Amino acid sequence: MQGTIRDMSSKPTAKARPTPDAPVVVIGDAIVTELQETEARGGLTSRSYVSGSALNVTMALARLGVPVALIASIGDDPDGVRIRAHLRKHGIRFAPSVSLAGTGRAISEPADGEPLYTFDDAARARRIRFDDEQVALIRAAPFVAISGFAFDDKKQHRRLLEAVIRPQERLLLDPNPRLGLVEDPVAFVDNFERHVSSALFTHLSDNDADLLFEAPLDEATSDMLDLGATHVLATEGNRGGRWVNRAGIDVQKGNFSSWEE
């Protein structure tokens, strides 16, 4: 049953470290990707796998041994069953919003050597209900990570603002905009920046900076700090990244692919 966020206690309940009872909460997308590949003889083969930026973040945290829960939109359909089973197999708590539109799908097709992604209507219609179970998870979480969220939806934006108490201590943002999923780029940027202004941590890639702000990554990084973000991680694929914060720390590392384990 969908609850009302204002009915929930506003008393902060987050603990300092994630535990099974108060895991890190990841909010965003969980979809199935169909990968089409060109065979040597010129034909196409396809395979599918569970994916989505929020699901991928969740899996990465689980592999590191971090207690984590996922909040995402899926359908009551075979793809939704597949996602549930995948998370259950890895012992990850899942608090879904079940969508009448179904579970989102992305189709990856080869184009000039690079994958070209298209998203179906269900992926574009992904929405989080912020029901009682989801809000309780968010309120108890030591950290709340956002990736692949529909920032261009005004209601989603407002519900997230209401749900995350003390964002300056807990909110971790990754816009991860995708062509074909962002329906209103102006609203997406405006609402994302509203969350950045009070976030603990914001991640931006060079692709994010170009797609959202039409600006170089360094410029967009400075803008995030000016908006109020406490920490910003700016990355350029395997070319490296830069961590800066409002206290004056500025650390840069080039060529991630050369890092030793």
Predicted stretch roles:
Residues P67-V68, F94, E169-L171, V232:
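Hydrophobic anchor at the start of a short beta-strand
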Residues F143, S147-A220, R239-G241:
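Conserved beta-alpha-beta core of the PfkB/ribokinase-like small-molecule kinase fold
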Residues E34, V66-G148:
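Conserved N-terminal subdomain of the carbohydrate kinase-like
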Residues Q2-H90, S258-E260:
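Glycine-rich phosphate/adenosyl-contacting loop at the front of the ribokinase-like
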Residues V26-I27, P96, L172-D174, H203-L204, ...:
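General beta-strand structural signal in soluble alpha/beta enzymes
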Residues Q2-V25, L217-E261:
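Conserved phosphate-binding/catalytic region of the ribokinase-like
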Residues A136-L137, R194-H195, L225:
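Structural alpha-helical scaffold elements that stabilize or flank donor/cofactor-binding regions
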